[in-house]
């Protein structure tokens, strides 16, 4: 069954879910109950790259409309006015385009903008220098991008990190008269803050294809003269609709004829025989990957995986996908166990894996090492019974079970740290569920993995960072499963 139009509820898909595969012609799957499909053993596929060119072209179209005041000039001329001086525009030639994020669609936008002779600056912590050179863009930090850009486009998923990445604070850092284009996700921009900036002239124009609430009917940005809006048309061209339809049909045909799985959203490639053996390791790999991903801050170059002891005797390919999906899940919106290796490859992340049948300190262990442009992070985990256990982080021995909300702290192994930490959390009425410590040597570097009953605020993180012995504090979240 393939489709891309009407939203459907799980109760209306009973017959469909008895089939082997559901195909979605496009990227969005809000019209498919993936949980119900998974429960019924049905693979859900989509076509995330079939409309990339169309969406990128829409971004360029919005930017050009904004630069030359085309929508307002069109309306004015239809009304019989002839306001040439009022709608004087600006050239794109030699202007600085600041791109926040540079994935698949972003790289196409960069290519088109380069053809317009724009200077392209990119903020993307996960874009390697090698990939930046390949697509001919210059990496900069976010503050620099905000300060120097004439046009700013958004190319990131909506996550906790990117939500309202454009707000009053970031707008203050921008050039006077900057123009902002958002085709990516509603919620990336604080719309009230943008409205104020448009009225004041700080932002001389904005063009949006997406909004915080859709369908958007009473948005605060509507009616503003300097605002160009379209109703989520990014993927709406005849060519894109045809491309995604052909792609999803080919994917489904390949699966039904020879078992090939492409762009599946809800299931790794695991045989019925392997499934019960791999089940506890899948959970362990998800936790290892998520932990490594949340303590890795810059663009990843190399991902090294080692399976030791009992796990080395199993089919480890699905486990590699789970590890990479967990690693990338905190920074990317649509990562799953099937597409994670492809996403990593597209971002020039080199994945290597090895097997060591001989047991080491544990009868079974999985090691994940992540190399970035600045540092290396490692996480090792094992199973106690069938329960996941983290046994090493950043080359420091520790034994920890992971809960939904955690704190990861690096500190100096000196007296007073635990007492200060406990007092601050107690004052904030944050209860500690478990507390795990590890250190390299007496008085040396130490780490702590602390499970707490609820997420902590940014203000509390700042307070914890002020403890004299503390080097860094990171809130971790393991509540949402990727499988």
Protein language model annotation of sequence segments:
Residues 95-96, 119, 302:
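Residues that mark the start of a beta-strand
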Residues 1-17:
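Single conserved hydrophobic/aromatic residue that forms the stacking wall/gate
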Residues 44-45, 121, 177-295, 312, ...:
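Rossmann-like dinucleotide-binding domain for NAD(H)/NADP(H)
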Residues 25-26, 41-53, 124, 142-143, ...:
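Short beta->alpha connector loops at strand-helix junctions that form conserved
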